[in-house]
Structure formats: C-alpha cells, structure tokens
A protein has these predicted regions:
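Class I S-adenosyl-L-methionine-dependent methyltransferase catalytic core
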Residues: 1-46, 51, 55-69, 74-269
C-alpha cells in the first residue's frame, strides 16, 4: 500500500483500542503475580491498556491526544511516513500506526506506571504492611503491583472515568481493592503506609480541572493530610526532599532517558 492508501485507511477506521479476552487478561495478571519480573518489565501493561481506554483521550502538554490526532489527515500522514521509514516495511497495522503517534513524538500517549515497578517498590520498601494507600491512583499500575503481592489496595483519584475503569479491572480480576473518586487535596485519613506517583505539574492533561502543583507540593499535601508510618513517592524532580531519595529509576525510550526519584519518608512515632 502507498502512503496515501494508508492515510485513507486511517481516515476510514476508528481509533484502535486494545481488547483482550478474559483468559489472556487473567494470564497477564498471573504472570505479574507469580513470575519474577524485572522492575522495568512491561508485564501488566496490556491490562492497563485494555481497561483504561481513556488514556488515549489524555494528552501531553502542547500535543494533541492520540485519539484526536487520529482524525487529522496532515498529522497522520506524517506518522505514516515515519513508520514506513523506520520500520523498513510497506505493511503497517493500525496498531503500528498508533504506536507511531508516540514514537514520532507527534501525539504521544501519557505515562503509565509500570505494574512490575510498583510490585518491586512495594516489595522493597513497604512489604511489612498489608494495606497500601494511594491518593492519586491513576491508571491502576500501583493497584496491580500491590495486589500481585497479595496486599489490599486503597486507591482514590479525582477523575471519575479512571476510577470507573479501575473498578471494572478490580471486579474482573477479583482484586482486593477499595476505590473511590475523591480530591486528595481536600481529604484526610490515617493509614499504615502511602505509595503514589502524583501528577507531574502540568506536563500531562486528563481533561479535568485540577490544581497544578509541583512534586514537592504534592508531597507536602500527602504529609499534611495523611498520617502514615511510611510514605513512598515516585517523582520527576525534587528540591525539598533530596535527602529522602533512596534510589533513582532510569527510563529509556524513544523520547530519550529520564531519571525518576524514589522518595521514602518515615514518620517519627
């Protein structure tokens, strides 16, 4: 097919979403739960893409959301040209082209917290606790990691759509999780431990009105609003809490490399 033929195909095709049968989804979770995983493994990502189609409606700052870019012929022709050039093939699937939106950086997908990374961090820093509280639960990566370790997960998020999607995942996979839609900025509570990856300022948009805070400001909020024995945060940068960094996560992708900071804070008894 020619570039223009691919473009015509895209323009006549709905945005490709991920759909898997229950057997495959269960196998994905069992792999996360029972098999040893590297922290940067993509195991469990398919679960997130299946249950959270709303990720494709969200966008990186100054970029279109992938699902909106799909309907723009000028953008999609650039993506198709990019895919044909770098894949060195003249046979593309709709999913190849969708991936090209992120790889070409034209309309990249928002970030997903790897379930394998969540499992690794909980096991390393919070394993003495049976219940994990997450005030910014997002697209369920930390829920999957916690439940893969047979922990109970309590998660909340300001976005009602992602909570609805997470509840469907919980119900289908029979996960031990309590989920609710709540604004953590105006909440309080007491838990054994807290584990979250708060929004990175205004780098990503989820089509809702939220207050824009820095990572340090989010940590301040969590320490003020929630009384816990331990707090575990993954953030892109910190000035105020540098002394509490216990490790860095090095990510490599088509966008280059980045280092996320893992911050562990223990509350004095």
């Amino acid at each position: 097919m020619t570039n223009l033929e691919y473009l015509n195909l895209v323009m006549s095709t709905d945005f490709p979403l991920d759909h898997y049968d229950s057997e495959y989804l269960t196998k994905q979770f069992n792999n996360l739960k029972y098999k040893e995983q590297k922290s940067l493994s993509n195991t469990g990502i398919a679960l997130i893409k299946h249950y959270h189609p709303s990720i494709w409606r969200c966008n990186i700052k100054n970029h279109l959301a992938p699902i909106n870019a799909w309907n723009d012929p000028e953008i999609m022709l650039k993506v198709i040209n990019n895919r044909l050039k770098y894949l060195k093939t003249d046979v593309l699937s709709a999913y190849n082209i969708r991936s090209g939106l992120s790889i070409s950086k034209i309309a990249p997908k928002v970030s997903i917290f790897r379930p394998a990374m969540a499992k690794y961090l909980i096991n390393k820093y919070l394993n003495e606790f049976e219940v994990i509280f997450d005030p910014c639960c997002g697209f369920s990566g930390r829920m999957l990691g916690a439940c893969a370790l047979n922990k109970k997960y309590i998660g909340q998020d300001i976005n009602s759509i992602t909570i609805k999607e997470s509840k469907q995942m919980r119900n289908d996979l029979k996960l031990s999780a309590d989920l609710c839609c709540k604004d953590s900025l105006y909440d309080s509570g007491e838990y054994d431990c807290l584990f979250t990856c708060p929004p990175y300022s205004d780098k990503e948009t989820w089509h809702q009105d939220i207050e824009i805070l820095s990572a340090d400001e989010w940590i301040d909020v969590c320490l003020k609003n929630y009384k816990c024995k331990k707090y575990l945060f993954v953030v892109d940068k910190t000035d105020k809490y540098k002394d509490f960094i216990v490790e860095e996560i090095k990510n490599s992708s088509h966008f280059g490399t980045s280092n996320e900071k893992v911050i562990l804070i223990k509350r004095d008894s």
